[in-house]
């Protein structure tokens, strides 16, 4: 392989060391072009006609990536890798998900015809596109750089892209055996797809991965389960860990992408996978980036567990304190570089380390006057009726907390027949039950599947009450406008919140992602 990276062999050796939990790698997530002397005289292609050409025209992308790599810095351990990703989790598109090109990324929407059957069609246009794109890039690269493996993803994340996150979370409760079968089917297809794409992009046995622009001397993959932030440790060990372990056993070099503080409780299960080589940490929105002291203990746990670590978006100011605290063995630094001067500063720093309630009785006797005794008797009667109502409605509360739809509906029917006011059913029992579920979630005793099941049970019961509330302001609990702010392209959490709010009786106006303030006000 003739390459534009002059120190490629040194970087390869550092990667081999890192996969074996030794040494430091100094790189960055992608590349920068500021002040970089081009490695070849390559002109960029004409601007893409539209988003479709920008993402889904293999020849245009191959020409663009050829120009991009030729003008990118390859200092330190930054690798020449063409980023061929077709959206996060593009295995879902191969299995029938729908592509949509955006300005900065590709979205994969659920398959409207998905019927829970996991089917690989070797003639599917999205599968053919993957192969055509990689072949076009490989031909254009001509040995000057690696063609990266697309971000296929796997498991629950792929299934969520096919049928919707909320439906997958419900499946963990409603059809767990079916879900396990689907996880195995997705894994089997993953290996088939991976191997065929590997044969296109490989350089001998070597390969690179588009995310983190990383390299290995054999097959390598980035593994993940972003949806795992919403499930319990028991569910993770049932629906995620066995299939991640199988990937680690069949792929030579594996890096797990641990995404967000909500996923940290799964670290023990990851460390149990002996074959897993390394763990990458992404703190998530609202958290300090990977070089923060907040994550030192996390990195130490990963390293102590026998895995190498990848820290992302580390700044120059954070670099030395980070290495002082976690050591200099098995550490992959994805720096926040902007120019080659910053790379040189980081290299000098690295050299320092590489060189060296109570019941009321009805027969109460008082000495009160007759009128006051009558009032007391009336109070007792009201309390008795309230107690009877509570006895009647307690099963509704229990059903919603347990996420049981049919019992919730039956109890609501009985309550309507007994004359219990719809407002009392909603305010006194449904909302109270959802409050209990929310508290359990906050305490770590329930997870998103349990929230969704409870919302589903309440929504089913609420449907019986809506006709009785027609024309009443209480027909819905309230109206909520939901969307992600301008610049935020994440919609999984937003859609889950919208689903749960609807289940609780709110009218939800979902205005989508990347929404300006004006559109929020207009809605």
Each model region followed by its residue ranges:
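Active-site loop segments of alpha/beta catalytic cores
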Residues: 1-47, 63, 68, 72-81, ...
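Glycine-/proline-rich flexible loop or hinge segments
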Residues: 41-55, 114-120, 436-447
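Aromatic- and acidic-residue-enriched carbohydrate-binding clefts of CAZyme catalytic domains
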Residues: 98-114, 216-230
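Extracytoplasmic/secretory soluble proteins
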Residues: 70, 92, 96, 105-109, ...
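Domain-level signal for soluble alpha/beta catalytic cores
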Residues: 367-523
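A gly/proline- and charged-residue-enriched helix-loop-helix capping module
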Residues: 104-132
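N-terminal accessory alpha/beta regions
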Residues: 77-89, 93
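Acidic, aromatic-enriched beta-alpha/helix-loop junctions
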Residues: 52-65
């Amino acid at each position: 392989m003739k390459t534009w990276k002059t120190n490629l062999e040194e970087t390869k050796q550092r990667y081999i060391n890192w996969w074996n939990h030794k040494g430091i790698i100094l790189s960055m997530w992608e590349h920068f072009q500021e002040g970089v002397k081009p490695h070849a005289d390559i002109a960029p292609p004409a601007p893409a006609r539209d988003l479709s050409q920008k993402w889904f025209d293999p020849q245009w992308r191959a020409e663009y990536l050829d120009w991009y790599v030729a003008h990118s810095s390859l200092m330190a351990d930054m690798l020449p890798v063409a980023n061929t990703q077709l959206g996060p989790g593009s295995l879902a598109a191969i299995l029938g998900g729908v592509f949509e090109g955006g300005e900065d990324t590709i979205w994969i929407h659920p398959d409207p015809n998905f019927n829970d059957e996991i089917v690989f069609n070797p003639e599917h246009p999205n599968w053919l596109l993957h192969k055509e794109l990689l072949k076009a890039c490989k031909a254009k690269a001509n040995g000057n750089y690696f063609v990266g493996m697309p971000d296929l993803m796997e498991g629950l994340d792929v299934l969520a892209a096919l049928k919707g996150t909320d439906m997958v979370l419900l499946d963990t409760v409603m059809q767990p055996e079916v879900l396990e079968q689907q996880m195995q089917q997705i894994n089997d297809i993953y290996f088939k797809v991976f191997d065929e794409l590997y044969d296109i992009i490989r350089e001998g046995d070597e390969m690179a991965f588009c995310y983190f622009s990383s390299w290995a001397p054999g097959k390598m993959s980035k593994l993940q389960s972003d949806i795992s932030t919403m499930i319990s440790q028991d569910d993770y060990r049932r629906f995620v860990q066995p299939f991640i372990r199988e990937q680690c056993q069949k792929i030579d070099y594996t890096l797990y992408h641990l995404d967000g503080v909500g996923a940290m409780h799964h670290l023990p299960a990851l460390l149990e996978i002996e074959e897993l080589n390394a763990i990458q940490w992404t703190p998530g929105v609202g958290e300090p980036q990977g070089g923060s002291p907040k994550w030192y203990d996390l990195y130490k746990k990963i390293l102590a567990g026998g895995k190498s670590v990848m820290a992302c978006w580390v700044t120059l100011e954070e670099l030395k304190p980070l290495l002082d605290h976690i050591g200099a063995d098995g550490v992959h630094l994805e720096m926040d570089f902007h120019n080659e001067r910053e790379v040189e500063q980081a290299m000098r720093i690295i050299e320092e380390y590489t060189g060296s309630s109570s019941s009321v009785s009805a027969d109460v006797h008082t000495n009160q006057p007759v009128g006051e005794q009558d009032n007391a008797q009336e109070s007792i009667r009201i309390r008795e009726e309230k107690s009877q109502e509570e006895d009647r409605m307690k099963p509704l509360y229990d059903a919603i907390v347990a996420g049981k739809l049919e019992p919730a509906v039956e109890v609501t029917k009985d309550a309507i027949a007994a004359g219990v006011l719809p407002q009392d059913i909603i305010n006194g029992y449904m909302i109270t039950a959802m409050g209990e579920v929310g508290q359990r979630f906050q305490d770590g005793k329930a997870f998103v599947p349990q929230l969704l099941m409870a919302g589903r049970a309440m929504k089913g019961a609420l449907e019986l009450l809506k006709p009785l509330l027609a024309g009443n302001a209480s027909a819905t609990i309230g109206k909520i406008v939901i969307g992600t702010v301008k610049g935020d392209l994440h919609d999984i959490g937003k859609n889950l919140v919208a689903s749960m709010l609807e289940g609780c009786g709110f009218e939800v106006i979902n205005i989508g992602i990347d929404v300006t303030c004006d559109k929020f006000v207009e809605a």
